[in-house]
Amino acid sequence: MSHLILVRHGQSQWNLENKFTGWKNVPLTKKGEIEAKKAGELIKKHKIHIDYIFSSVLERANKTAEIAIIEANLTNLINNNKLIMTRNENLNERDYGDLVGLNKEETANKFGKEQVHIWRRSYDTPPPNGESLKDVVKRVSPYFIKHIKPLIFKGKNVLI
């Protein structure tokens, strides 16, 4: 039986500052590093073998995976002290466009809470110059179907 393991990146500096992050490279906080270690502890505790790792190209996601895999002691995924991981921008999180870098509370005060809620939670209404959730699905799904789904169907365990 194969497993698909989904791990969200640990807290980033902009998560802490309540800012829209999108595709901006923002480092993990100390709390984010601890969260990544806890993910690794859970993988180890449940004896989950991982065959493949896929990630966005964003450093916070890559660092989370690296910390978790080291903590889980999955040496099969490390070569020459580097994590064996496929990085692809099709797996990046949502692009918030013109909202990137803005404080969420200040943005709600400027544009109205309802409008910001629509931009964040509506399926097909993107923020200005950003992606809707529909756009994200359109970007991620073909990559997932082509590169990840076949591995799962072959019985491999994949961490994203």
Where are these regions (language model features)?
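Short secondary-structure boundary/capping segments
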Residues: N18, N76-L77, P150
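Phosphate-coordination/substrate-recognition cap region in phosphate-metabolizing enzymes
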Residues: A39-H117, I145-K146
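Loop-to-helix element that buttresses phosphate recognition and phosphoryl-transfer chemistry
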Residues: Q11-I67, E71, A108, P126-P142
